[in-house]
Amino acid sequence: MAKANLLVTHDPNHAGLAKEEITSVLKQLNITPEFLKSEIEGLFQITIKEPKEVIKKLVKTCKKDPSMFRMTFHWVPVDNWCKSTIEDMQKTIKGLVKGIDEKDKWKIDIAKRCYEKYHTTELIMKLTDVVERPKVDLKNPDKIIRVDIIGNDAGISLLNKDEMLNIPALKQ
């Protein structure tokens, strides 16, 4: 089964308009998204080419014209998928840590959907155990370890600040 390499949150009351918005915005970059089946209301699971590069362009687009984004909220690339067990997520994160230099400031960012096994704080403690980098910075990190837990699966990414689109924050 194909796995998404881009997650986009949207207003669940306007899924059709959100899908049109995504398609329209990506069409401007000559990109055709493949929408995969998503069991979660308010979340599209999508496959596109080079999602991190696309998001960098969309961040610039949103800064210039935030009105293009009315129905979508967060656009997050996914590097790897694994099971949402602590052990599997730690193993996947450990594989990404080499992308964080010793001098880099970093943080972990977790979003949970249909997952009640652990509270977010407990997850943060357990998942950061495998990150042997000294410089944590929650406000201005160089690197973000993004964990999107969707039931029994977890999408995990190592992102630069401009590789994740947070539309509500950019509109402020």
Which ranges hold each PLM region?
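SAM-dependent transferase fold signal centered on methyltransferase-like domains
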Residues: M1-Q172
